[in-house]
Amino acid sequence: MKVSDDLDASLEQRADYIPTEKLVQETATDSVLFATVRKALLSSGLKTLVGPRGCGKTHMMRYAWLTCQGDTSKPFAVYVSFNKYYRLEPLLVSRASPPDEFHAWALGLVVLATYSSLSYKAENATAVSELEAKVGLPRANLETLVSALERNQPLSAEQAALSRDISVNRVQKLLDLACSSTGRKRTVLLLDDAALTLTPTYLIEFLDIVRALKSSTIAPKASVYPGTTEYSARFHAGQDSTAIFVWLSVEAAEYQSDMDQIARCRFSDFDQIPQDVVDLLRFAAFGIPRAYLTMLQDFKERPAKTTQQTLNQVVEAHLNARLGEFRSIARKVPKLRELISVGETVLNGMVRAVKASNTDSTVVQLLVGVPKEDLTAIVQRMFQLLIEAGLVFDAMEVKHGTPERIYQRFIPHGAALLQS
């Protein structure tokens, strides 16, 4: 498969590219994990949705937002994507007060998304105009401000004044007014692509904004990546927020049924695909629905060869893409180059260890244990990078032996195990 074809196939499986009308029919609503996450997204309180790229965070957020639009028994929902955050990186060196302008950009996107949610129903068009007048944050002006910040353009006097006027208090007031106008009692704020991993300075600022927006009537939900998400001195995971993990372990009891439900929603001929193919690609997907869908699509579209040849090529292409993405971190953040290199070496060592442990065993063993005392800060950082990239699954710690020792357990990527 060509690189361009691989990209096209991946984009087809991204929830960002699924039209709203198809989102519902392509959602596995009976999935155990999905039901848990959907409930958390619509609940009160601040939650972080934790999982690597492709595990369904965007899909779940967009679906939760959509189900709230026509159901007044549910909260007023606002969906915001921050996937263009990297465009603000130049501001860190070109502006005198980049955090202030980042605040204006982030809060501006929340306001614009609120207007969009309110106007989703045509009958609410006048409510948006009234809201703009009440809070003094005109939609058109905000759009030009956000655009200027994303293009690193100098702000006009009017835009600079508007950027100073956008405060957390004003945005909270707007959210409460919008919520009230729809007859709802509270708002869920679905903040997607909130990890901002390549710009830690902005991530810290962003999480402070999220924490500040939280109120008795506003419940922010932020999607973040596992492993590398840094929390600010004022944002404490576990105290300020509850983490909801959306990455399903290949060892979970519901793994097969959940993954296959997702595939069945996307492929009408899923049940005609040979079972051995499904089983292998499901394992190779390593709990990432987008990977599963992309590999199934790749298998279906490849020129006819032997099934085993085709499977090997599909899994190899997927693994190479994942490793390529992991290696690209070293180019984007040069100071991490050595950690990335060592991380790949450790991944390969874990794969060899798992393979060796299963040579003469009748029970498949996927776990690799690392003594907790060996997890120095730098070693932990290396594992965090592997986890964020979805190459290693954190299976939590366990206590063993006498005297008792604590081991951190990890599972190396399924595709790497299959290709070893």
State where each predicted segment sits.
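Short acidic, S/G/P-rich loop/turn micro-motifs used as interaction or catalytic elements
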Residues: 56, 194-199, 393-394
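Amphipathic alpha-helical "lid/sensor" segments that cap RecA-like P-loop NTPase cores
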Residues: 274-335
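C-terminal leucine-rich, beta-strand-based interaction scaffolds used for sensing/assembly
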Residues: 82-83, 315-420
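A short acidic (Asp/Glu
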Residues: 60-62, 88-93, 198-204, 230-234, ...
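Conserved beta-strand -> loop -> alpha-helix junction used to position metal-binding or nucleic-acid-contacting
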Residues: 75-84, 244, 310-321
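The catalytic "switch" region of P-loop NTPases
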Residues: 166-190, 194-286
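P-loop NTPase nucleotide-binding core
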Residues: 45-48, 52-185, 226
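A short, basic N-terminal segment
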Residues: 1-47, 52, 67-74
